[in-house]
Amino acid sequence: MLWIQPACLLSLIFSAHIAAVSIKHLLNGSDHDTDVGEQKDIFEINLAAGLNLFQGDILLPRTRNAMRDPSSRWKLPIPYILADNLELNAKGAILHAFEMFRLKSCVDFKPYEGESSYIIFQKLSGCWSMIGDQQVGQNISIGEGCDFKATIEHEILHALGFFHEQSRTDRDDYVNIWWDQIITDYEHNFNTYDDNTITDLNTPYDYESLMHYGPFSFNKNESIPTITTKIPEFNTIIGQLPDFSAIDLIRLNRMYNCTATHTLLDHCDFEKTNVCGMIQGTRDDADWAHGDSSQPEQVDHTLVGQCKGAGYFMFFNTSLGARGEAALLESRILYPKRKQQCLQFFYKMTGSPADRFEVWVRRDDNAGKVRQLAKIQTFQGDSDHNWKIAHVTLNEEKKFRYVFLGTKGDPGNSSGGIYLDDITLTETPCPAGVWTIRNISQILENTVKGDKLVSPRFYNSEGYGVGVTLYPNGRITSNSGFLGLTFHLYSGDNDAILEWPVENRQAIMTILDQEADTRNRMSLTLMFTTSKNQTSSAINGSVIWDRPSKVGVYDKDCDCFRSLDWGWGQAISHQLLKRRNFLKGDSLIIFVDFKDLTHLNRTEVPASARSTMPRGLLLQGQESPALGESSRKAMLEESLPSSLGQRHPSRQKRSVENTGPMEDHNWPQYFRDPCDPNPCQNEGTCVNVKGMASCRCVSGHAFFYAGERCQAMHVHGSLLGLLIGCIAGLIFLTFVTFSTTNGKLRQ
């Protein structure tokens, strides 16, 4: 089939819901939910712990710098150990942070297997790390209050070689430092360093960087900032830590000289004419069209019609032709490394309710051809003509294509069709629940502190009923201009056979940044882990996570019981919501998951005796003269300072030499993927075949690669024959010409 102009796609969700808004108002004395407080700044945590580290959270070696010294850059993947003294929630948050690195960058991690260089994550005092690979075992401390995904990403970036953003030599062009407002003896944290010490990797100053100080870092007066931005609009942006910025990722990939991610299989926003290599079906009745946002009723999801000459999507017109006519749109051939994928996309159906939108896969037939079709999910038309998000779980282990099939249900009663935009295929699980809240701007404007919206019930993979509560203007905090988010359990169909109280489950709530490219999303993720210690006097000291029909309250909206809530009354600022793409299309999207972490209770493995903590650590702003003009007295530590150890002096301080045994090391299977790192040479694709790495080699028109690791280059036989023929012909022609010339000379 020929391309015309396109719009396309559809989806499946484990559990999805678009909110019919019902706002509940807080009555005096009726609020018994638990607020865990706001996320504390890293430096606030470290100050409370009595730590005075270099730049607030760095143990700095005297002699090397990973931004300039290639030997301090890690060999990927990076080995790690999760110490048993870590909180269970911290372990889950660390693994979640690893997945963000795998999804958005070329950096990867692997469980420790005796390597000389590795990272051990421990619960020591405060949140801190070292800069770069120290060529020995080294700590990252995830202490009390540090177990947030973004905080962990921040400390890992230090370990990968990054300093704070405002340490750049050109920072005074972009921010103001109010020296008189800085706590005495902490001024060193605001020093800048020249290009001989750190490098910006040829990138611009980044207010949104995960590595930027907040406006109130190390301040004397809690209401007066120590750092403000030259562009006032960024004063409320710096220091907010939702996720990596786009420039953070550019620097990370430049530092490690690689660009490919590990778990992103495909992405398409249809902004380019080649529509990401997708192809039309050849045996169907019609084609998908590559549409744009030139018409008011045809607005894309990527740019929501805000850019003239841009904003494309795929579209299948269901208002013309005959009932039952269909059009296929297929992806390029994809090679998975893991056994599970999540296909996420945005779609809308504006035609007849009888229209159908289906997701299929075309699989390897075991003879090398991708041809066997299997239906995965069907979507039916409805009266909601807004863009919707969809998630479809795939379980492909061999090469495959995903396929979108649109079918006309009743052209005579259709005035539109099926739209598709912003496709993302990752090798990660789909969320258990997806809650879309429409008209969010009106909700933010018309609600007050304490007003709340309660999500419908979702089910996780174990069968627990879960949900979230949204506080559009916060819950009970004194600060205004914030959105709150909490988690609760619902009674459900499976309660009779489930474990109660439910413990060791990590509740994960994500407010989605709807940026088209998942690598550039700065979504906010909050998580905590259930415990039998989480009780409430409102239920006579019972565990909050006991069976909801026993300790919860009846909710007529779901005809079920709902537990007390646990979460954050001040989760994210309205300014950040409006600055990014959290409110695209005037909709707020929230993901919810509930994952069992019991297998992570015992994760520690003994480290090699040869691996020791590096000597020569600088603390308290005591960097050497080579590191800054305003440096102070240096202190050389011969071992990990006692102030950084455990809070409980009666307990033996852990080091990388005292890690103890590990029992039931039940890591997810994908951590042992033989294709991580890719063993294939010459841009070959690695495929996991029954636990063994199998290389799919690149083939061109003239040359192809072969061998177990695609290490040998060959010339195609047809081209080789042609070359031999050409050479033989050239020799013959030369001989004839020479003979003819000699004959003429003799005459």
UniProtKB/Swiss-Prot annotation:
Residues 638-663 are annotated as: Disordered. GO terms for cellular component: membrane; meprin A complex; plasma membrane. It is a single-pass type I membrane protein. Residues 65-713 are extracellular. CDD domains: EGF_CA, MAM. The active site is at residue 155. Residues 65-259 form the Peptidase M12A domain. The chain crosses the membrane at residues 714-741. It catalyses: Hydrolysis of protein and peptide substrates preferentially on carboxyl side of hydrophobic residues. Zn(2+) binds at residues 154, 158, 164. The record marks 601 as: Not glycosylated. GO terms for biological process: epidermal growth factor receptor ligand maturation; signaling receptor ligand precursor processing. Keywords: Disulfide bond, EGF-like domain, Glycoprotein, Hydrolase, Membrane, Metal-binding, Metalloprotease, Protease, Signal, Transmembrane, Transmembrane helix, Zinc, Zymogen. The half-life at 58 degrees Celsius is 50 minutes. It is found in: Membrane. Residues 671-711 form the EGF-like domain. SMART domains: MAM, MATH, ZnMc. Residues 1-20 form the signal peptide. Inhibited by metal ion chelators EDTA and 1,10-phenanthroline, bradykinin analogs, cysteine, CONA65, and several hydroxamate compounds, particularly tyrosine hydroxamate. Its main location: membrane. Disulfide bonds join 106-258, 127-146, 268-430, 675-686, 680-695, 697-710. This is Meprin A subunit alpha. The lineage of its organism: Eukaryota, Metazoa, Chordata, Craniata, Vertebrata.
